[in-house]
Amino acid sequence: MLLAIQYPSWLHPEIIPGLPFLRWYGLMYLVAFGIAYFLFSYQVKHGEFERYSGCQKAMTQDDISDLFIWGILGLILGARIFGTLVYNPETYLKAPWLIFWPFARDGAGNLTFTGFQGMSYHGGFIGGFLGVILWTKKSKFKFAAVADLMAVSIPLGYTFGRLGNFANGELYGRITTSKIGMIFPQTPISDRFYLAESWVRDFAEQAGLLVQDGASMINLPRHPSQLYEAFFEGIILWLILWLLRKKKPFDGFLVCVYTLGYGFFRFFIEYFRQPDANKGYPISFGTGAANIYVYESWKNISTGQILCSLMILASLAAMLILYLQEKKLKEKKGNIDG
């Protein structure tokens, strides 16, 4: 008996099979941006921007729309450039025009529409961050105050971005015999396993898979790590920030909590997620470092975990600096009032 969850048979990358330009991935991005826009507008409409940030300049709906244009543009550019040049530089440094080329050739050599697959969260974070900085400089708003509102607005939308990855059958986890494992039908041949290897047959048996007569390869169950990320980095992180939004001690606190929380959750979920084959483990002190498809040791650190560690350290440093600045301002104000 199969001891894994069946991937939904009705779910395909295309919303309507045969219409490649209508894809769940793109739709989920639109939903994510829409949710972030709604939550940001909600906070501004209810006076939370002025009340909890100390910012005296009112923000209009036109300001919000302009901000999101800058932020989304920075996010998309950063996510795509970072995702291609950091994770697959060999291909894109030779042909940089492919970075924004939404087509690829399938196994038969036919040109097919794929959209912008290979969007890096960390690149999107940096790009969106820079976009918001540029907008606040242009519009004369306090960056830390605006960033706090963005931090509260983003995670719930991010949830749908990961659901888009799930619909694409990409960014899946490592193989597992757990009952919450899932067989992704879109798994390419390069990520399937040869039945000639005894450990593969044993693994398939533990997972309750039936091996077809004459089959040479098998698609093993994997952790649906996209759903883990959607839940922890999306829903849970959003709930934490939503509850803290009226209790922040200083401007910039919430964006630091967001960066810290995302880095923390993602670091541990990376142990379930399969690293990029061309990157493997940049840091490996544990056993089985060559086997990226199965968890061997917590000492094997992926590129994603290195980037998350930098996020955690940067958020802690920024939080300390902002706290000391706020403390200094209060002391200065107290001396003046005294």
UniProtKB/Swiss-Prot annotation:
Pfam families linked: LGT
Locations listed in the record: Cell inner membrane
Broad EC category: transferase
Transmembrane segment boundaries: 24-44, 67-87, 115-135, 141-161, 224-244, 252-272, 304-324
Keywords: Cell inner membrane, Cell membrane, Membrane, Transferase, Transmembrane, Transmembrane helix
GO cellular component: plasma membrane
Binding positions (a 1,2-diacyl-sn-glycero-3-phospho-(1'-sn-glycerol)): 162
Main location: membrane
Molecular function GO terms recorded: phosphatidylglycerol-prolipoprotein diacylglyceryl transferase activity
GO terms for biological process, alphabetical: lipoprotein biosynthetic process
InterPro entries, sorted: Lgt (IPR001640)
EC number per UniProt: 2.5.1.145
Protein task: Catalyzes the transfer of the diacylglyceryl group from phosphatidylglycerol to the sulfhydryl group of the N-terminal cysteine of a prolipoprotein, the first step in the formation of mature lipoproteins.
Name the record gives this protein: Phosphatidylglycerol--prolipoprotein diacylglyceryl transferase
Gene this protein is translated from: lgt
